Amino acid sequence: MKTFTAKPSNIKREWLLIDATDKTLGRLATEVAMILRGKNKPEYTPHMDTGDYVVIVNAEKVAVTGNKRKAKTYYHHTGYIGGIKSVSFEKLIATHPERAIEKAVRGMLPRTPLGRTMFKKLKVYAGEAHPHTAQQPKAHNI
């Protein structure tokens, strides 16, 4: 029997809606990364983007275990000499709550052009409202 490979014309993408309220950040990010890659589908093909679109709401209510709310630190560099910046999880959630989930999921996707196209299918919103009602996303429980 020949190995199955998905064809771009045969890939059916769905829109999934996930509520991040009281979900642990890492466990949520793992499930979302699997959906974005398409590993939850039988037609998964490693060199193709077979994943679904994911809309995450209530990003500001995501949970972390232990002392991570105060102790977890995110770093980025401005590009200038001595330009390393850091922000705690607590401050990041207060200012840009969607970035914490985006950074967690981004770290679980491949660091290739294919991984970047997979990441573009992730839509994260701080509150309950989102502009994707026309796509009729299906509620997905984690």
UniProtKB/Swiss-Prot annotation:
Pfam family, any one: Ribosomal_L13
Disulphide linkage map: none
Gene Ontology cellular component terms for the protein in this record: cytosolic large ribosomal subunit
Known function: This protein is one of the early assembly proteins of the 50S ribosomal subunit, although it is not seen to bind rRNA by itself. It is important during the early stages of 50S assembly.
PROSITE patterns (UniProt xref): RIBOSOMAL_L13 (PS00783)
GO molecular function, one term: mRNA binding
Subunit-level organization: Part of the 50S ribosomal subunit.
Keyword tags: Ribonucleoprotein, Ribosomal protein
Protein name, as recorded: Large ribosomal subunit protein uL13
GO biological process: negative regulation of translation; translation
Gene giving rise to this polypeptide: rplM
HAMAP family documented for this protein: Ribosomal_uL13
